[in-house]
Amino acid sequence: MTSPIIVRTVAEMREHVRAWKAAGQRVAVVPTMGALHEGHLSLVRLAQQHAERVIATVFVNPKQFAPHEDFDAYPRGEAADAEKLALVGCDLLFAPNATEMYAPGFSTLVSVSGVSEPLEGAARPQFFGGVATVVAKLFIQSQADVAVFGEKDYQQLQVVRRMARDLDIPVEIIGAPTARAEDGLALSSRNAYLSAEERAAAVALPTAMKAAAAAVAQGGPIEDAERSAVAALQAAGFGQVDYVEIREASDLSRLGPGPIGEASGRILVAAWLGKTRLIDNMAVG
């Protein structure tokens, strides 16, 4: 088992990337905020299928958190993250601090309109500006040929795809299927916040999504499936439901009212269980 090279500056990372590319090797990047779990490791393994060298980045990005959100409480543990990356043979861990990413006087924000505006964009207005900015920087800094993101953050994946296309960033973006626990709950760093009772109740989230997706696939009205999913979550003990919506899969435009027809849809959900906000999504139709 070989530990990944750990670097903290863009200059150090680029030295390694230059050497790899001079040797004719492709480079993949897997951006994360740390607190790595099997879902993240599955992204690294997928990246290894598309490139000879893989960089995992760990940076809890302050620009995507609003003042009232969980930036300070977000789980961190670089040593544990490095050990997990060693198990899957990741080549390099880029772990910058905030000053390395945002030097004094930093004044630029990457704004992606359209696909970023509904759902998470409406619930967390600051979020996607921070995401698009840091991901654009990571693409430029790493000069990666390939980037791998999980479909668990589906809207984020679509925002990043739009941003890279619009800015002509020459990186192939690959979406990886959501990694799930045996009971169907999507793996997430925030699952660590759940009590044992909440963790047992959380399975209602994928269950409600599956039921809604099945109802729509059988020709049921989209709006009825959405309402039924909200009711199922509330009955299971979820408090505030930020959204349950079935949207067009690529641009997240609204579908309905009525049946889905020939459209390719995606159900996207965000809801609170105690003090923990869980998100998930699933293909529909």
Curated annotation (Swiss-Prot):
Main location as per UniProt: cytoplasm
Keyword Cytoplasm found: yes
Pathway: Cofactor biosynthesis; (R)-pantothenate biosynthesis; (R)-pantothenate from (R)-pantoate and beta-alanine: step 1/1
Keywords from the UniProt entry: ATP-binding, Cytoplasm, Ligase, Nucleotide-binding, Pantothenate biosynthesis
UniProt KW Ion transport keyword: no
List of residues binding (R)-pantoate: 64, 156
Protein name, per record: Pantothenate synthetase
Cell compartment(s), UniProt: Cytoplasm
Miscellaneous note of the record: The reaction proceeds by a bi uni uni bi ping pong mechanism.
One of the GO biological process terms: pantothenate biosynthetic process
Record-stated family: Belongs to the pantothenate synthetase family.
Pfam families for the chain: Pantoate_ligase
List of catalytic residues: 40
Any GO CC annotation of this UniProt entry: cytosol
Catalytic activity: (R)-pantoate + beta-alanine + ATP = (R)-pantothenate + AMP + diphosphate + H(+)
One function term, GO molecular function aspect: ATP binding
Function: Catalyzes the condensation of pantoate with beta-alanine in an ATP-dependent reaction via a pantoyl-adenylate intermediate.
HAMAP family: PanC
